[in-house]
Amino acid sequence: MSSHNHGSHHEPAHSHGHGHVDEDMLSVEQAYERVMARFQTLEFEEKALLDCMGQVLAEDIKSPLALPPLANSGMDGYALRHSDIVGASHETPKNLEVIGIVAAGHMPNRTVGPGTAIRIMTGAPIPDGADTVVPFEETDEVERKREGKPLDNVAVFADMPTGCNVRPAGEDISEGTLVLERGIIVRAAEIGVIASLGMDSIKVIRRPIVAVLATGDELETAGTPLSDGKIYDSNSFSVAASIADAGGIPKILGIARDSLTDLTTKLEATSGCDLVVTSAGVSKGDYDIVKEVLNQKGEMNFWAVRMRPAKP
């Protein structure tokens, strides 16, 4: 398939200028299916996580651990036993001894027994013996701080159900869960999830290297003076940008002049590339020689596609 740097005619799609449908031409969908049927998956590579942005995941990702790994608090408050606050209210508060504090990232060093509580911060592991977390707002903590009283005791004003504000281990992801399937494109969200599993590298399909070649004596390279009868090559840049946007690595080969020798030389420079995209030179004009050269190099899988803009 190819496109021209020239403007296109605005005739109805699927026809020549005389309204005749060429039965030998493929639909865009048929052409796409033929192209995709010839592709094979490229080899994978293991790369640092941040270097994988936009690439295709080559393996299933299963969680090696539970997330969160331990039961933890969903609120800043007091970790305690529900049995100690049954019937608690502002009229009938339940008073408990505060025996410690635990912050996120630290393990509790005390066990919550009858009549006791531990101050706990959001994300901190639940101490042994505790089964419920009561937020600070449902206690007299604010009042105690305002009055300068020590936080060695607390009055609880709410009878909160067992397990309230406790996030169980594995609530987000249980160990062994299939988190991401091979074949997806790795974006920012996927990178965050993978990092949360403790992984700093993954296997991805390597990016395809795609050669881009424009053909025609009428073309000049952007950034050079424009001679009479010439136009600037724009297709190479738009195609290369599309390749990069889709996750490939574009390799612009420049402009091949309308000679078999020059075109053949340029195409020989595509070794190491996974795909070659040519622009122009595939019509029926005297100097449209891409088809001739390609037929010498291999099999022509299909020729014309019914689409606009593209076919003259």
Residue ranges and their predicted role:
Residues 4-26, 79-252:
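Short, glycine/charged-enriched hinge/interface segments at domain edges or termini
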Residues 23-89, 93:
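Intrinsically disordered, low-complexity, positively charged segments
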